[in-house]
Amino acid sequence: MAVPFRRTSKTRKRKRRTHYKLAVPGMVKCPECGEMKLAHRVCKECGSYKGQDVLSK
């Protein structure tokens, strides 16, 4: 089984791992109630989407 000839340096290891980060979710303010919600999704607080009430509470 092959093994690395040289030890991987901290810098090289960290450069490779820069792409292993989590993506930040796109949060927007709901125009109806003003609460923060995920973009292109129904608001959990007021149940509206694109100005229409889709979830009745």
UniProtKB/Swiss-Prot annotation:
It comes from the Bacteria. It holds the Pfam family Ribosomal_L32p. One of its GO terms (cellular component) is large ribosomal subunit. The keyword Iron-sulfur does not apply. One of its GO terms (molecular function) is structural constituent of ribosome. Keywords: Ribonucleoprotein, Ribosomal protein. GO terms for biological process: translation. InterPro entries: Ribosomal_bL32 (IPR002677), Ribosomal_bL32_bact (IPR044957), Ribosomal_zn-bd (IPR011332). The keyword Disulfide bond does not apply. Belongs to the bacterial ribosomal protein bL32 family. PANTHER family: 50S RIBOSOMAL PROTEIN L32, LARGE RIBOSOMAL SUBUNIT PROTEIN BL32. This is Large ribosomal subunit protein bL32.
